[in-house]
Design a protein with these regions (language model features):
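N-terminal signal peptide c-region/cleavage motif recognized by signal peptidases
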Residues: 28-29
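Hydrophobic, well-structured mid-protein blocks that either form specific transmembrane helices
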Residues: 108-153
Length: 241
């Protein structure tokens, strides 16, 4: 049983704590005109232990601004599903629910974050159970919908910003700091795209994450590089549908 538990923990930590990152700040009205369109793409996730291919898509459900961003992938003897439900009204993203379902052989691991905006409470169900008060006048994102906000911030011309994310184990809501550091290039399905590179550094985790945004694709994040003491992790877009 020990190898099974170890693999699930590896997959969980890699995807949940390294995969994504960037969120919301109160900024100028320049953002009001920026809309992030729906998309669907094939991504490949790799690190030194795991490689998986999956579909990631952003879906708008109705005119009231209810949206979902999700990632579904398969790997040997298992699968993973990550879903973020949120609403977007007057250019403000409001988190609703964040759900993770990992299955590997006979092991199942489900986790859910509930953002109760009415009561101002954030609750975690699953392996880590906790309840945390949301911060007044601060927008708190989840690990998926934060990437919508990083795109908005870069489109608006922000070079540095700080956004709020919960620690998935403890519930502590922490500021994550981001900075535009460079330009680069990345090839997707035979086309080379110029990119703006945004870096996040978390000193408490000894971790550095870089996001590659392609202006020609509505600033879509087409590559993520993550480095920490456990090694390198990569998420790369292979094809858009």
């Amino acid at each position: 049983m020990k190898p099974k538990v170890t693999l699930v923990q590896i997959i969980w930590s890699s995807l949940m704590y390294k995969y994504l990152g960037v969120l919301f700040i109160l900024i100028s009205s320049d953002l009001a005109a920026q809309e992030i369109p729906d998309y669907k793409g094939e991504y490949v996730f790799t690190n030194s232990r795991v490689s998986m291919q999956g579909i990631r898509e952003l879906i708008t459900h109705n005119d009231e601004g209810e949206r979902t961003i999700q990632f579904n992938a398969k790997f040997p003897l298992g699968r993973i599903k990550i879903i973020s439900d949120f609403s977007e009204t007057d250019n403000r993203i409001t988190s609703t629910k964040y759900y993770v379902d990992v299955k590997w052989t006979l092991i199942s691991d489900k986790r859910t974050l509930y953002f109760d905006q009415a009561s101002g409470t954030l609750t975690s169900k699953g392996k880590f159970k906790w309840s945390q008060a949301l911060i007044e006048n601060e927008n708190v994102f989840d690990p998926l919908n934060v990437q919508i906000q990083i795109r908005k911030n870069v489109i608006a011309g922000l070079m540095e910003f700080s956004l709020m994310l919960p620690d998935l184990k403890t519930g502590a809501i922490e500021a994550n700091n981001y900075k535009v550091i460079d330009n680069g290039n990345f090839e997707v399905d035979g086309t080379n795209y110029s990119c703006i590179i945004v870096e996040r550094i978390r000193l408490q985790d000894d971790r550095t994450t870089r996001y590659f945004l392609a202006p020609d694709l509505d600033y879509l994040i087409i590559k993520v590089e993550d480095q920490d003491q456990d090694g390198d992790t990569m998420l790369e877009l292979k094809k858009l549908y």
